Every structure is written in structure tokens, then in C-alpha cells.
């Protein structure tokens, strides 16, 4: 697999001799659309009816196919205040965008994140806000279903 990020909000890769490209398009202030284009006739889209503050990729599951990692701002059933959340989407059957993990929270309220691809296992490094107002940096790894706190 070869993967590169050539422009903001767009990345592409080769896997099994197939070319794939993922992009994020802003349709309005509260509607973003993830597009998956392949060298096949199929085209997959996933609508995000929330503001997006971050868009990245990385093979967090270790299966050889990059996942799409998106930071959205939205409320949840148990936390009605709109806040920053972390969503992870997988590429199913090398053709379709599907949710893998729609995280309502990490350990503390999320401020920002970055995907760390330098390690053998891809990590998600977050900046989180403590109740005291201080910030902490944490690293998470994929553990079957969901993110597991690896280091602070």
C-alpha cells in the first residue's frame, strides 16, 4: 500500500493495484461530504451533517487499508452541548465508506487530534481539556472496537 496526502482535505493511495482517492467537500456550514473515488465505476459518499474541524487518515486497524478520521462538532444524547467528537470510517470491500467508530468522547473533552503514522501501529494523538482548564496530550491505539488510551 502506498498512501499520500497531496492537498488539504484529500488523500489517495494504491492497494491491490487499485487507485483510491478520498476527499472532504464542504457543501454548507453544517454539511460536509466524504467522497471515495476508485478506478472502478463505483463512487461512494458519506454525508456529515455537522461542522468538521479536522480531516485525516491512517491505518488505525492495521488491516492495510487506511481509515478516514474526522473531527466533527455535534451534541450527543448524553451530552447535549455541541462539542468536538472523533469519528472513524473504514473503506469496506475497497469500495464503500462505512462507520467504524463514532466516538462520543475520549478521556477528556477533545480540543484537537493528529494521526501519528510514524509508528508500526498508527496512533491518534489528542489534545484534551481538563476541568481545571489545563490541557493534556494523550495517545490512543485501536483495540478491536474503539480507542484505547495508550499514553499521556
Region roles according to the model:
Residues 2-152:
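Beta-propeller-forming repeat regions
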Amino acid at each position: 500500500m502506498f498512501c499520500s496526502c497531496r492537498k488539504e482535505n484529500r488523500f489517495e493511495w494504491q492497494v491491490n493495484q487499485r487507485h483510491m482517492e478520498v476527499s472532504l467537500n464542504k457543501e454548507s456550514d453544517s454539511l460536509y461530504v466524504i467522497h471515495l473515488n476508485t478506478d472502478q465505476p463505483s463512487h461512494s459518499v458519506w454525508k456529515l451533517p455537522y461542522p468538521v474541524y479536522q480531516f485525516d487518515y491512517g491505518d488505525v486497524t492495521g488491516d492495510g487499508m487506511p481509515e478516514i478520521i474526522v473531527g466533527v462538532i455535534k451534541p450527543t444524547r448524553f451530552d447535549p452541548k455541541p462539542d468536538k467528537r472523533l469519528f472513524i470510517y473504514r473503506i469496506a470491500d475497497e469500495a464503500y465508506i462505512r462507520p467504524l467508530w463514532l466516538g462520543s468522547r475520549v478521556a477528556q473533552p477533545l480540543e484537537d487530534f493528529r494521526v501519528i503514522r510514524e509508528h508500526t501501529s498508527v496512533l491518534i494523538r489528542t489534545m484534551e481539556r481538563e476541568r481545571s482548564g489545563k490541557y493534556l496530550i494523550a495517545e490512543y491505539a485501536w483495540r478491536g472496537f474503539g480507542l484505547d488510551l495508550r499514553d499521556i
